[in-house]
A protein has these predicted regions:
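Primarily recognizes the serine-hydrolase "nucleophile elbow" in alpha/beta-hydrolase
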Residues: 133-203, 221
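Conserved alpha/beta-hydrolase "acid-adjacent" motif
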Residues: 246-251
Length: 305
């Protein structure tokens, strides 16, 4: 835990500070679907400058609020990537939240549980429970945080994109206690080089193995191949992907096609090159996808009450 604190302070002081706090996702750390086990969470800042957090079993939500005079009322929950093995918590988490807050969008970094048979009764739903809890938490605290509860979206990178798209296609069934019947449907999704499908030849085998296990049934693979779960209630979506990504751009193509087929609004930024894991800025392009997403949000989510 000492290493985590040091790295957290490093990140905190390295960036301009908006109103922010890290809070337990579940009250009193009463985490559902959990097995009592030692807290082995570990954070490490690699030589490549990437902050990686592993073995997360106690999820948190970090809150980044814009100044009231800049607030748009929009909110986004950010799910870092990492193959359901680690969380790339800096360039796909805190850095992104800071940038959204600068642009007037309240941002929330979700440090979600990483699937483990050692800490979860059913590891396949653990991350989804955390995403649903984050949506519930933001909506139920919308007044305090100066947020319109009808402008709460979710953003995910890579495997975090799989989690975000799972939240956007599996919201009909609550995996958490929801006594107030708060809507668990995100109002929009932003999916950046996402894993969408677990079909062979499209999906990311590492993410599938970490979430579903070594030999998942076809039923389970289909359930979490989110292009197969789209319906008329699926939220509007923005997709960002590079054509040379090792997580095949076919993930985004197939999701885009199904969304269009179902009449769901979808917009895209597809780069000719850029690879995987570039975060907010693709150094091989002059296009800033954050600018594109900001314009998309203003166009489609500004006039809500």
């Amino acid at each position: 835990m000492k290493n985590i604190l040091i790295l957290t302070l490093m990140v905190f002081f390295a960036i301009p500070s908006f109103s922010q706090k890290e809070m337990p996702l579940y009250n009193n750390y009463h985490v559902p679907n959990s097995i009592s086990a030692p807290d082995e969470e570990h954070a490490e800042l690699g030589e490549d400058g990437i902050l990686r957090i592993s073995k997360v079993s106690f999820p948190t939500l970090s809150v980044y609020l814009p100044p009231k005079e800049k607030a748009t009322g929009q909110a986004v929950i950010i799910c870092p990537g990492g193959g359901y093995w680690i969380l790339a918590a800096g360039h796909e988490g805190a850095d992104v939240a800071e940038e959204f807050a600068k642009r007037g969008v309240a941002a929330f970094v979700l440090k979600y549980r990483l699937p483990s048979d050692e800490t979860m009764i059913d590891k396949t739903i653990g991350p989804l429970q955390d995403a649903q809890k984050a949506i519930q938490t933001v909506r139920e605290n919308a007044k305090e945080w100066n947020i319109n509860p009808e402008k709460v979206g979710i953003l995910g990178f890579s495997a975090g994109g799989h989690l975000a798209s799972t939240a956007g296609t599996h919201f009909h069934q609550a995996q958490i206690d929801n006594p107030k019947k708060t809507s668990l449907r995100p109002d929009f999704m932003v999916l950046v080089y996402p894993v969408i499908s677990f079909d062979p030849g499209i999906g990311h085998s590492g993410s599938s193995k970490n979430l579903l296990g070594e030999n998942p049934s076809q039923e389970l693979l289909d359930k979490f191949s989110n292009e197969k779960q789209v319906n008329a209630a699926t939220p509007p979506t923005y997709l960002v992907h590079a054509k040379d990504d090792r997580v095949s751009i076919r993930n985004s193509y197939v999701f885009e096609a199904v969304l269009q087929e179902k009449g769901i609004h979808v917009s895209t930024t597809y780069f000719e090159s850029g690879g995987h894991g570039f975060g907010m800025v693709n150094p091989q392009s002059e296009i800033i996808w954050m600018d594109e997403v900001e314009a998309w949000l203003k166009k489609h989510f500004t006039n809500l009450p």
